[in-house]
Regions:
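SH3/SH3-like beta-barrel superfamily modules
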Residues: 202-234
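Boundary regions of SH3-family modules and the immediately adjacent low-complexity/disordered segments
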Residues: 70, 153-185, 192-195, 199, ...
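Membrane-embedded alpha-helical segments of integral membrane proteins
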Residues: 103-144
Length: 241
């Protein structure tokens, strides 16, 4: 069961999804329904250590948002979308949380298309295309008289396999290089260098999403949507894996 708290519609209900294995999940949902959002968040966090699912991340994001922790909510909505990239509820709540902070994130079309599927889904699609291509090649060798009839299908599945494999590689590359971190403290000081003695150049508030450029010891080099860059303490942000 997943609590579908649609921030953008301001309603809350319970939808059936992939069943969670323990009554603790239902107990956490009950805490949320009772308005005990901090307690619900703690309960969802405990469950995440054993069975991280899109439903858990989604519900935890809702509990964090209602607890006044927009950064942690945004982090968990991202995690839900990593596991279930076409979930309209997680995407809708992520956009609502951003708008509540006065933030608009323009995602490049190529990145949006890559994230419509998980890397595992791209791998399955590539594998299916490759398998069908080899099967048609084998049939063409076994039945020479039918080779011409299979030609267009063979070419089609060959193209599907190549394109899917390319998208799989691109999806893995995008996840490795487009590192994202979310500020989870009320205000994070951004410094010109990875030194506590450096004077803060500017600050990032709770919920700000930033691209991770580099890392050194307890510091991350980040760039915000306004193209400002600097170093923040790791403890100030949660980095998406």
């Amino acid at each position: 069961m997943k609590i579908v708290f649609l921030l953008w519609l301001l309603v809350a209900s319970v939808w059936p999804v992939v069943a969670q294995p323990s009554s603790e999940f239902e107990a956490a949902n009950k805490l949320f329904e009772q308005g005990r959002f901090a307690d619900a968040a703690a309960a969802y966090e405990r469950l995440l250590t054993n069975s991280p699912t899109a439903a858990l991340h989604f519900n935890l994001g809702n509990a964090r948002f209602k607890s006044g922790q927009p950064g942690k909510a945004i982090f968990h909505y991202h995690q839900a979308l990593r596991l279930s990239p076409r979930d309209p509820d997680a995407r809708g709540n992520l956009q609502f949380a951003r708008r509540s902070l006065g933030v608009t994130v323009d995602e490049p079309l190529a990145r949006h298309l890559l994230r419509l599927h998980t890397p595992d889904e791209w791998a399955r699609l590539a594998g299916a295309g490759l398998g069908a291509w080899f099967l048609l090649l084998a049939l063409g060798e076994t039945l020479p008289a039918k080779r011409a009839a299979f030609a267009w299908l063979t070419k089609t599945f060959g193209v599907i396999a190549i394109v899917s494999a390319s998208l799989l590689a691109a999806a893995h590359w995008e996840r490795r290089t487009a590192g994202l971190a979310v500020v989870v403290v009320p205000e994070a000081a951004v410094r010109p260098g990875p030194l506590a003695e450096s004077k803060a150049a500017f600050t990032l508030r709770d919920g700000t999403e930033a691209v991770v450029l580099d890392a050194k010891d307890d510091w991350l080099h980040v760039r915000d949507s306004g193209q400002r860059a600097g170093w923040v303490k790791r403890e100030s942000v949660w980095r998406l894996p």
